[in-house]
Amino acid sequence: MKNKEREIIKIILRAYDHHLIDQAAKKIIDIVTKTGAQIEGPIPLPTKKEVFTVLRSPFVNKDSREQFERRTHKRLIQIVNPNNKTIESLMHINLPSAIDILLKK
C-alpha cells in the first residue's frame, strides 16, 4: 500500500463581525476552487468572548458599573494539495482590513 501524503494549508480567519468573516471565507473558497484545489471548510471555531467591567463614576459609587463585551469569531479553511496557481492567487487576494489572517502549513 502506498502512503499518499496530503499537503494541507490551514487558513484561520479572525474578526469581530461574523458577517464580514463569512464573506471573506466565501471569497477565499471561490478563488481556491477556480484553481482546482480541494477545500475543507469553512469550519467555525469557538467564539472568544471577552468582558470588560468599568466603573461608571470617576470617583465614588463602586456599585455602579458598566460591562462591555468583545466577541472574536474564527473560521478555519483547509486547502488540500494546493498547486502553484492556488498559492499565487492567495497572495493577491484583497480582504477587508478588519479580518486577521493566519496561514499554517
From Swiss-Prot:
GO terms for molecular function: structural constituent of ribosome; tRNA binding. GO terms for cellular component: ribonucleoprotein complex; ribosome. Keywords: Ribonucleoprotein, Ribosomal protein. GO terms for biological process: translation. It holds the Pfam family Ribosomal_S10. Gene3D superfamilies: Ribosomal protein S10 domain (3.30.70.600). SUPFAM superfamilies: Ribosomal protein S10. Coiled coil: none annotated. It comes from the Bacteria. Belongs to the universal ribosomal protein uS10 family. Part of the 30S ribosomal subunit. Involved in the binding of tRNA to the ribosomes. This is Small ribosomal subunit protein uS10. It comes from Phytoplasma australiense.
